[in-house]
Amino acid sequence: MSPILTNRQAEELHKSIIAYLTANNLLNTANTLRAELNLSENAFDTATAKKYETLLEKKWTSVVRLQKKIMDLESRMSALQTELDNATPISLAKRNKDPASWIPTAPARHALESHRDTINSVAFHPIFSSIASGSDDCTIKIWDWELGELERTIKGHTRAVVDVDFGGPRGGILLASCSSDLSIKLWDPANEYKNIRTLLGHDHSVSAVRFIPLGASGAPSSGNLLVSASRDKSLKIWDVNTGYCVRTLQGHTAWVRDVYPSPDGRFLLSTGDDSTARLWDISVSNPESKVTMFGHDHFNECCALAPSSSYQYLSPLTGLKKPPAASSTAEFMATGSRDKTIKLWDARGTCLMTLVGHDNWIRALAFHPGGKYLFSVSDDRTLRCWDLSQEGKCIKVMRDAHERFITCLRWAPSIFKDTPTGHGAGDGRNGDSKKTEGPDVQIRCVIATGGVDMKLRIFAN
């Protein structure tokens, strides 16, 4: 008898094995085992065989499920232990007071519901407490993120609204949206979000839209130019005043999923289904892809340029003794892919590091305005924080941040007091200023996420 099992447990195991062998037509083996165990035919009749014939398989699958659950719990415990190790009472108190070190924590301040389908994108108003969300339900909704209230619903697109962004000329902030209906629309927040212009020219779904910053000294503000990315494999630059496409960038060989402008408006970072990221210098008359980054094993979903506040943490990875000047843009960047990884790159296209931890597609990235952290969201329903000062170590995992896939992430743009209409540099997806860059810059500790659960979640200090 096994020293681990009781007599009854051993008997059930023996009968289960015999029943399994019999059910799989291994009769000789079953009879031999029955004889070895001295089980008579009366002790193992038809009723007994029926009772035990699936028991072994059920117990086996139960063990496999239990093992997976144990592994998941061990992984979660390890992540929590890491977070605990990095969170002394002193460091927590300091982090909560210092915007440059603030990290979002659960629960969300607001979980806003009104959309009837997946939320694909979110964008903060650069001045007011308004936030826009675009959805597969073909609408854009404007919310007050401080009060957690719906302000209005904007209709106009005939298919899914894929991306939204605030920006525009100085003194005239606009909301831009793009859609699977092949169009880009401009809306005027000062006139009840009236549709003032529709931009047509792409031959397939438009997957991303961003205002291009002017890049003036001090706070970068958006100008008259807008960039869009499309499934037609191209990027287009538009003049929002005239509605004309002033430039088309060709180079990607498949769907372009995302685009991110540099704070000075000189560079664009794009990525997509050809598994590459491309850095474009649009300050020249005939821009071509300046650098092409290869390395991901699946389609790329998102990209982001690192703010200058991150240079001090990323420069050691390149062997530089001193970080590049803060005025130098597009020195470092990040890409997220369906291969479940995030890659960090330098301006030469060298992969500096691969961040592994997500269990599903990476859907959006956001650099902390303070420069120390990189945030990511994924179809694994988590929001993760990677510490760039610790060589990209994952220091926080917010599990079940949404009930289903998380599709978008955005950081509220910093406030530039001397330039109130500033869009916030490549707020692109997330904002990228740092309080220490100047006395007139204030980091807003607010992020928003959206997902397939049709909820817009606001995390704020």
Swiss-Prot record:
WD repeats lie at residues 114-155, 157-197, 201-248, 251-290, 312-355, 357-396, 401-457. It comes from the Eukaryota. Residues 9-41 form the LisH domain. Belongs to the WD repeat LIS1/nudF family. It comes from Arthroderma otae (strain ATCC MYA-4605 / CBS 113480). Keywords: Cell cycle, Cell division, Coiled coil, Cytoplasm, Cytoskeleton, Microtubule, Mitosis, Repeat, Transport, WD repeat. Positively regulates the activity of the minus-end directed microtubule motor protein dynein. May enhance dynein-mediated microtubule sliding by targeting dynein to the microtubule plus end. Required for nuclear migration during vegetative growth as well as development. Required for retrograde early endosome (EE) transport from the hyphal tip. Required for localization of dynein to the mitotic spindle poles. Recruits additional proteins to the dynein complex at SPBs. This is Nuclear distribution protein PAC1.
